[in-house]
Structure formats: structure tokens, C-alpha cells
């Protein structure tokens, strides 16, 4: 692999080079890390996280956002994080199929990443891929997560603006309240608002937000409505996204967002390294199950530590 040639094509705006670079990073090749080192921090895009329960219409909303942003002259990239099979590691890469109508538009790039067991709903390579997309020069990057739940708050650590998408479906809003994901959202969108119960969900959200503690950044989250297949509510959503971006700039919060993203990326690398070492240590785990090793001894061998040097284990 000629890293110099790939970097040159990348900087020339060749999307095939971008795709190759992301593949190298996602697969863990050293060439991918070398490219990241050379390209990180070149440009900064507006990063929007889209999260919500399965069936909330995230992909349809993403598709319509691409259309609306392109009409404004913005270039757009989408990272759609798909669920992985717990057995094969394969992903159901359906999001990209829904948005294939934008294929051929040089101002649009869509990529699906498999979550591969990432607890926060984000693939381990998501932030690294995000850095490559920024270096490529996209104006706006949409990151669509697997779903929503107690562990899926990682999106708020990656995105500048986090959009929580709900529907009038019974229990959808209540589940969001219980799961604690209310705190991660900068904007709320009740999609499929034309279905029965839409107004009820909007009122529930507004009431809950009025009682909630003030947002740390001083931002007051908005509750919006949309019917994504018809394009309804898209203009209001774009205005709200612009308003939040302006708020971050005025308060000087973009730098802290980037710092939090870097912290998340380092933590993700450490977690992925740990998962990889665990897979490599299946033999040791088998020996623990057979009573031949203690868990501490197995962990010491996995980490390459001398006996008795595993910190954090009680005496």
C-alpha cells in the first residue's frame, strides 16, 4: 500500500481514496493510522448525531436532510452505524440502501459502519472515520446511531449537536425518559407527527423539559415535529441546527466538544484493545473455567503483567 499516493488522491478529493482510507482505519491496518496521523485536524465540519429507537425514521430523516442541505449548497457525509450480528460480526447495512438515490452526487458521501459490539451504539472506528471525513472537507457530517438505550449516550460525546428522534408510538417518549437519554439531546424531533398521539408526545416532552435541570451549556432544547417522507418539518429542523451551532460558537464551546470527542476516541481504542485481547485469550478463559487459573492470573497474562502486578484487585 502506497500511503503517499493514497494521501495525494485523498487530498485531491477522490472519494474512492476516502473509502479506502476508512476501510483501512476500520480494519485496523497500520496504513490507516498513518493516514489519520497525517490528516487529523485539517478542517472542521458541523457534526450532527441522530439517535432514536428502531423504527423512529432516522434513515428517512437523514435522507431528507441530505436533500435539504444540498439545496443550500452544503456538502454532506453520513456515517450510519448498523447493528452487528453477535455471532458473525456482520451488519445489516440497510441505511445506505435507503439513501442510494444520492449516489453519483460528488457532494454526498454515505458510509455504513458495523457497531461490532460497541456498547455505546457507535462503531469503534466511528470517530476515526469522522476525522477522515472532516479532513476531506465536508461541510456537514450526520452520524446515525443504532438505536437508543441506557448505554447509547456516547453519541453526545461525538456530535456537536445531538438530535433525539421520537414517534407517537405508545411508550416511546416514556422509554426515553426512563432510559435517561433526555439529557443527551440538544434537539427533539417527533417524527411521524401525522400519526395519532403526536401532539401528546410533544406536550409530554415540553413538560418534562420545563421541569428538567438547565442544560450545562445554557442551551434550551427545542421540540420539533416532522413527517420525514413528506419533507415536513425539515426547514424548522435546519433552522434549529443552525441556531445550536451559532450558540456553540458564541459560547466558545466547540473546542471543548473536540476535546471530549478525542477523549472518547482514546477510551474507545482502549476498550476495543481489551475486547481483542479477550478474544485472543479464549484459551486462558477456558483454563479459568476449568479451574486451572484464577481470573486474576488470566488477566495478568492477557495484559502481559508479572504475577501480583494487577492493580485494582483487592489483596
Annotate the PLM regions:
Residues 2-56, 62-151, 155-173:
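Nucleotide-state-sensitive switch-loop elements of NTP-binding domains
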Residues 6-7, 113, 189, 222-226, ...:
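Short hinge/gating elements
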Residues 92, 129, 154, 158, ...:
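Alpha-helical scaffold elements adjacent to nucleotide-binding pockets in ATP/GTP-utilizing enzyme cores
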Residues 140, 161, 186-187, 222:
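Well-ordered beta-strand positions
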Residues 168-196:
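Flexible active-site lid/hinge loop adjacent to a nucleotide/diphosphate
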Residues 187, 193-247:
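Canonical P-loop GTPase G-domain recognition
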Amino acid at each position: 500500500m502506497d500511503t503517499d499516493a493514497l494521501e495525494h488522491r485523498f487530498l485531491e478529493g477522490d472519494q474512492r481514496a476516502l473509502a479506502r482510507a476508512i476501510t483501512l482505519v476500520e480494519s485496523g491496518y497500520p496504513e490507516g493510522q498513518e493516514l489519520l496521523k497525517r490528516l487529523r485536524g485539517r478542517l472542521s465540519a458541523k457534526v450532527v448525531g441522530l439517535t432514536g429507537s428502531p423504527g423512529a425514521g432516522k434513515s428517512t430523516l437523514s435522507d431528507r436532510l441530505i436533500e435539504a442541505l444540498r439545496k443550500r449548497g452544503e456538502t454532506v457525509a453520513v456515517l450510519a452505524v448498523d447493528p452487528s450480528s453477535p455471532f458473525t460480526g456482520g451488519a445489516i447495512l440497510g441505511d445506505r440502501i435507503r439513501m442510494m438515490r444520492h449516489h453519483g452526487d460528488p457532494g454526498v458521501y454515505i458510509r455504513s459502519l458495523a457497531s461490532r459490539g460497541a456498547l455505546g451504539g457507535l462503531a469503534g472506528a466511528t470517530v476515526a472515520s469522522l476525522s477522515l471525513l472532516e479532513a476531506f472537507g465536508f461541510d456537514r457530517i450526520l452520524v446515525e446511531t443504532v438505536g437508543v438505550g441506557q448505554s447509547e449516550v456516547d453519541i453526545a460525546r461525538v456530535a456537536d449537536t445531538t438530535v433525539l428522534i421520537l414517534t407517537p408510538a405508545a411508550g416511546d417518549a416514556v422509554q426515553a425518559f426512563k432510559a435517561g437519554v433526555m439529557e443527551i439531546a440538544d434537539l427533539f424531533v417527533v417524527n411521524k407527527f401525522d400519526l395519532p398521539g403526536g401532539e401528546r408526545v410533544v406536550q409530554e416532552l415540553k413538560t418534562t423539559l420545563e421541569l428538567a435541570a438547565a442544560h450545562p451549556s445554557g442551551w434550551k432544547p427545542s421540540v420539533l415535529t416532522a413527517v420525514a417522507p413528506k419533507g415536513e418539518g425539515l426547514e424548522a429542523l435546519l433552522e434549529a441546527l443552525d441556531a445550536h451551532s451559532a450558540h456553540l460558537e458564541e459560547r466558545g464551546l466547540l473546542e471543548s466538544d473536540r476535546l471530549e470527542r478525542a477523549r472518547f476516541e482514546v477510551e474507545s481504542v482502549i476498550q476495543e484493545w481489551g475486547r481483542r485481547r479477550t478474544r485472543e485469550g479464549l484459551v486462558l478463559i477456558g483454563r479459568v473455567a476449568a479451574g486451572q487459573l484464577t481470573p486474576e492470573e488470566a488477566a495478568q497474562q492477557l495484559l502481559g503483567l508479572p504475577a501480583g502486578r494487577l492493580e485494582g484487585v483487592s489483596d
